[in-house]
Amino acid sequence: MSLEENKAILRKAIEAINKKDLSLLDDLVAPNYFDHIAKQGQELIKQLIVMLYKGFPDYHATIEDIIAEGDKVWARVTYTGTHTGEYLGFAPTGKKISYKSVTIKRVVDGKMVEGWTVNDMLDFFRQNRTYRTHRKSKEPLSSSLAYVSQRASRKES
């Protein structure tokens, strides 16, 4: 596939998230997709997105920059939303937030097969002022994906 076609795959995935239509991801993300941060695959990513929708019903992603080289696509993304539902053990604050993310996806045969994403969660927590004042859960929170991984593994047991 061309570099532009690879970039289009990531753009379509972001559009699917913005439209809240995760079924569209099935055509864009390989069933054996592996996320290097979460150490799990496609279903965990969908669970994380659903959690975001619950915490931030107006959640929206905007691609600021997108670059492709070989089979990899890099994107700098800005996420916005209003915290009106529980998220990661934090009670709703009603605050509007905006945070940045950098994601790298490897694309093979028109599908994302591998991913790395770094979110600026410190900025997220600072804006929302949630870390010390609103967190219900007593579990340590090292990152949003680690938290989701913990919850997913508990459901399986």
Q: What is the predicted role of each segment?
A:
Residues 1-157:
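C-terminal and inter-domain tail/linker signature
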